[in-house]
């Protein structure tokens, strides 16, 4: 039996052959084809809108803004997220196909910003709702900072392994939040129902008995309240 002889590769054919792995090929194809879903609710989004102009030209990064979460693999949250908006944000994230990424842009998105101290309707950080890949602080961040965040995300994608991310996503459970911002395991939000188990109560009235509270209210006449 004669051995199989392979032809030798000359200089022309060797330059046209690429040896790589499936992970590197997948990561390379996703580096320059990020399709973001723009979730702008406040002034931080104005800074991102300036990237569309010719000065920064975010088209060179392959960014194609999409209006449907089913066609996007990146969601960029910019601005304040309230309790009423939270279920919609979680549903948009769940409708995005894998792999998907999140950039939290601005102080209001990351920590609640100036609303984090005495506002009962503001979410203190979007990472309590959806997992965040890149945090972009600022009030508001400059367009150069947004480009730097996109660059860091591209580097993170380049080092990613498909099996690890798939395993990590499969281990995650559905999450929900309360006004005290504690996470609990709940059923999927695809059902369209959202449970609000806790109502907000002012800390000043929590320790006051109902009898004392109504006595203090009855001591003020309606005439004084109106006038």
Swiss-Prot record:
Enzyme Commission (EC) number: 7.1.1.-
Subcellular location: Plastid, Chloroplast thylakoid membrane
Gene Ontology BP term (one): electron transport coupled proton transport
Keywords (A to Z) from UniProt: 4Fe-4S, Chloroplast, Iron, Iron-sulfur, Membrane, Metal-binding, NAD, NADP, Plastid, Plastoquinone, Quinone, Thylakoid, Translocase, Transport
Family: Belongs to the complex I 20 kDa subunit family.
Cofactor binding summary note: Binds 1 [4Fe-4S] cluster.
Protein name in UniProt: NAD(P)H-quinone oxidoreductase subunit K, chloroplastic
Enzyme class: translocase
Major subcellular site: plastid
Cofactor(s) essential for the protein: [4Fe-4S] cluster
GO molecular function: 4 iron, 4 sulfur cluster binding; iron ion binding; NADH dehydrogenase (ubiquinone) activity; quinone binding
UniProt function note: NDH shuttles electrons from NAD(P)H:plastoquinone, via FMN and iron-sulfur (Fe-S) centers, to quinones in the photosynthetic chain and possibly in a chloroplast respiratory chain. The immediate electron acceptor for the enzyme in this species is believed to be plastoquinone. Couples the redox reaction to proton translocation, and thus conserves the redox energy in a proton gradient.
Catalyzed reaction equations: a plastoquinone + NADH + (n+1) H(+)(in) = a plastoquinol + NAD(+) + n H(+)(out); a plastoquinone + NADPH + (n+1) H(+)(in) = a plastoquinol + NADP(+) + n H(+)(out)
Subunit structure: NDH is composed of at least 16 different subunits, 5 of which are encoded in the nucleus.
Keyword Protease: no
Pfam families: Oxidored_q6 (PF01058)
Topology versus the membrane: Peripheral membrane protein
Keyword Cell division applies: no
A GO cellular component annotation in the UniProt record: respiratory chain complex I
InterPro entries documented for this protein: NADH_UbQ_OxRdtase-like_20kDa (IPR006137), NADH_UQ_OxRdtase_20Kd_su (IPR006138)
Source species of the chain: Zea mays
Amino acids binding [4Fe-4S] cluster: 43-44, 108, 139
